[in-house]
């Protein structure tokens, strides 16, 4: 496939040609999870091209297992002096599960710490000429069009100036279901085409039905246009990427014929609320330690986080077609967290999956409030728990299974931590209220005392805290060691103050998130589906009554736990106070952290600053400026009534409607489509028809040229016949 291959359907309606290029259909079959497909794994093109070093696995995974074994032994020794009771056995099991989880992150952090001490530099591939073609995909679902289209505009312009722009095509793949946003997208696309048609090829497609959500959106593109391209560079609606990063990914993929997927580690940007800036700071200071360590030891068995990554089209279409899981949601149906599964399937087929921890210039945004984080995590939690159905898949690499298990534990760890806390509380209350049985039924000259090894328990507590906070400590050490890094966040004093503030605020938020995740897990186990709601990305504020409703159970849980603790002693209450205060103040914490005003205050005084905030990359500055311009361009949105009234506007709209056939002859018609057909057929004028449509029906009409033509033929308003005769 060569760069010169670029024929599209030309039309005079749209500047720059048709909304989408010619289709070149290709197969992307759902993969079997119960048996290894024939021909897998493929033979590597380069000798040892997909082989990883065992020594790195031994250091991180082996180290985590050894550390966990030591901690579990010590915990058992704490209880074993006086004999282990059933409640203590339960606590030992819960401790083992939780410690193994944090030990792996700690050992990855050690590896990342020493790697970052050496300051790894990206491979110099900038001079490599690109002879492959890459489709850059920007999926969007009911997002603000000004954000999405302005980002594509500035990235496309920057890429065109590198001399490599000819090797890339841009695609905005819309799954938008809101008819008003759909029309705004079309307006924004016209502006985008005006700006970019001389230097870039930019396309737009909105699906009529968003089957299988984002994974289905990308799969639809692959089956219809994927064969035109060697690579797919997948972004998210809030993604930004520097041109050097885009070309660097394509060059790395081109240089490694065995690479199936290369994932960048995005930096968080554009946070305005306190919660968003907290996440930005934590991700910037501590995130590289974990991310670099992970990339170092997983090597060719990396992971995919759904965006800001480049994928070899052959590998993706040939190996990563997702099957539907048997049964109904939440555990059956479409695979929600598709990214981990796609990476595992690509690796199963014999392609490498690499985390490019040394490649900067990749950006994304984060939820602005605790509530928005909870909404996103509810969906992610369901998708990750769904991975329990994927774990037994035939032929997966053990590291891929570990990625899936890690994703599951990201949410199951909260119930396990809560159970551990409750078990410890029950042990304390048992010791306080239940009279010990000094002489048991078994004959003994000495009484049985309920004792623990308190010195060993305290030592184990310090070890556990060290393992838990180890990655944070590593990040702070790297920050303080690097003078340039420290200055980029406001200096060492501001950096230390920011770290202290982040630790305190995170400690207050952590118990709230623990209960949110526990609620999500319980909801999923009860069979409730998460649905798919669009994300808020800017303002995280909500009415106080809404926040009280959202956090009512968290506050109640805090009161009950506090009451149980004080029944034992004030000392126990003091020990539990860091977690309890967060629960008691859940509503004001949620309100304050979701506030832009408070976020701006901490920005002014330089707390939680990041290098990207203090000295943003040119691409980020241009994106903000372009977004303001796009907001001005589409401040007067089209309406369906205007489209029906204006023939030129109708032609523009139809030029952007997906050209896929509406429905094969003889196939069942969907209820909503049948209802719309009846409403259009019975309508006496456009005004009466539009008044009858709900939002779902209006979105369907916008995507159906036949219905639009039928509506266009109707009079704009109904005039009774007798009134016409009188006139």
UniProtKB/Swiss-Prot annotation:
Major subcellular site: membrane
Compartment(s) of residence: Cell inner membrane
Domain of life from the UniProt record: Bacteria
Topology class, membrane: Multi-pass membrane protein
Bilayer-spanning residue ranges: 58-78, 90-110, 278-298, 408-428, 460-480, 496-516, 572-592
Region of interest called Disordered, as start-end residue ranges on this chain: 18-43
Task of the protein: Involved in the biosynthesis of osmoregulated periplasmic glucans (OPGs).
UniProt keyword terms in alphabetical order: Cell inner membrane, Cell membrane, Glycosyltransferase, Membrane, Transferase, Transmembrane, Transmembrane helix
Pfam families tied to this protein: Glyco_trans_2_3
GO molecular function: hexosyltransferase activity
GO biological process, one term: glucan biosynthetic process
Pathway: Glycan metabolism; osmoregulated periplasmic glucan (OPG) biosynthesis
Family assignment from sequence similarity: Belongs to the glycosyltransferase 2 family. OpgH subfamily.
Gene Ontology cellular component annotations, sorted alphabetically: plasma membrane
Enzyme class, spelled out: transferase
Protein name from the UniProt record: Glucans biosynthesis glucosyltransferase H
């Amino acid at each position: 496939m060569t760069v010169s291959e670029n024929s599209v359907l030309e039309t005079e309606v749209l500047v720059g040609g048709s909304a989408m290029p010619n289709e070149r259909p290709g197969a992307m079959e759902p993969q079997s999870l119960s048996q290894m497909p024939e021909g897998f794994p493929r033979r590597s093109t380069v000798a040892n091209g997909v082989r990883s070093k065992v020594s790195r696995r031994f250091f991180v995974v082996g180290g985590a297992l050894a550390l966990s074994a030591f901690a579990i032994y010590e915990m058992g020794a704490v209880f074993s002096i006086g004999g282990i009771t059933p409640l203590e056995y339960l606590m030992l099991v819960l401790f083992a599960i939780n410690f193994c989880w944090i030990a792996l992150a700690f050992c990855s952090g050690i590896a990342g710490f020493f790697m970052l001490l050496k300051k790894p530099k990206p491979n110099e591939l900038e001079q490599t000429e690109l002879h492959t073609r890459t489709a850059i995909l920007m999926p969007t679902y009911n997002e603000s069009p000004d954000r999405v289209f302005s980002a594509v505009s500035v990235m496309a312009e920057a890429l065109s100036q590198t001399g490599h722009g000819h090797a890339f095509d841009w695609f905005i793949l819309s799954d938008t279901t809101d008819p008003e946003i759909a029309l705004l997208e079309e307006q924004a696309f016209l502006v985008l085409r005006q700006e970019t048609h001389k230097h870039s090829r930019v396309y737009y497609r909105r699906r009529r039905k968003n089957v299988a959500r984002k994974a289905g959106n990308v799969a639809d593109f692959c089956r219809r246009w994927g064969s035109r391209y060697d690579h797919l560079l997948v972004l998210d609606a809030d993604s930004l990427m520097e041109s050097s990063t885009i070309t660097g990914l394509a060059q790395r993929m081109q240089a490694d014929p065995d690479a199936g997927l290369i994932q960048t580690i995005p930096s968080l940007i554009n946070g305005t609320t306190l919660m968003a800036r907290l996440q930005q700071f934590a991700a910037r200071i501590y995130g590289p330690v974990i991310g670099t360590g992970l990339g170092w030891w997983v090597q060719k068995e990396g992971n995919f986080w759904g965006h800001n990554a480049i994928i070899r089209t052959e590998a993706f279409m040939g190996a990563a077609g997702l099957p539907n899981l048997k049964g109904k949601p939440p555990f059956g149906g479409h695979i929600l967290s598709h990214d981990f599964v796609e990476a595992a399937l690509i690796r199963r087929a014999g392609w490498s999956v690499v985390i490019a921890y040394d490649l900067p210039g990749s950006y994304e945004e984060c939820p602005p409030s605790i509530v928005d984080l909870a909404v996103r995590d509810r969906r992610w939690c369901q998708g990750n728990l769904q991975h329990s159905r994927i774990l037994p898949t035939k032929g997966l690499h053990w590291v891929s299974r570990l990625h899936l298990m890690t994703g599951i534990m990201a949410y199951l760890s909260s119930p396990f931590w809560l159970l551990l806390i409750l078990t410890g509380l029950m042990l304390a209350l048992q010791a306080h209220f239940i009279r010990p049985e000094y002489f048991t039924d078994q004959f003994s000259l000495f009484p049985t005392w309920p004792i623990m090894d308190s010195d060993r328990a305290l030592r184990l507590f310090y070890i556990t805290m060290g393992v838990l906070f180890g990655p944070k400590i590593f990040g702070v050490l790297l920050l303080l060691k690097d003078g340039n890094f420290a200055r980029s966040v406001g200096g060492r004093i501001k950096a230390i103050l920011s770290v202290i503030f982040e630790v305190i605020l995170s400690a207050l938020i952590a118990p709230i998130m623990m209960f949110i995740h526990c609620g999500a897990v319980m909801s999923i186990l009860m069979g409730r589906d998460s649905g798919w709601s669009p994300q808020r990305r800017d303002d995280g504020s909500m009415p106080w009554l809404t926040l009280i409703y959202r956090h009512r159970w968290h506050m109640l849980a805090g009161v009950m736990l506090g009451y149980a603790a004080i029944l034992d002693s004030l000392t126990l209450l003091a020990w539990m106070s860091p977690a309890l205060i967060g629960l008691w103040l859940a509503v004001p914490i949620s309100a304050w952290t979701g506030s832009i005003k408070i976020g701006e205050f901490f920005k002014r005084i330089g707390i939680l600053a990041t290098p990207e905030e203090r000295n943003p990359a040119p691409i980020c500055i241009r994106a903000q400026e372009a977004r303001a311009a796009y907001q001005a361009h589409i401040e007067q949105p089209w309406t369906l009534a205007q489209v029906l009234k204006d023939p030129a506007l109708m032609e523009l709209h139809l030029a952007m409607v997906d050209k896929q056939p509406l429905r094969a002859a003889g196939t069942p018609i969907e209820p909503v489509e049948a209802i719309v057909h009846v409403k259009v057929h019975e309508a006496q004028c456009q005004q009466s028809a539009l008044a009858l449509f709900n939002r779902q029906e209006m979105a369907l009409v916008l995507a159906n040229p036949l219905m639009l033509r039928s509506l266009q033929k109707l009079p704009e308003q109904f005039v009774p016949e007798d009134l016409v005769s009188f006139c």
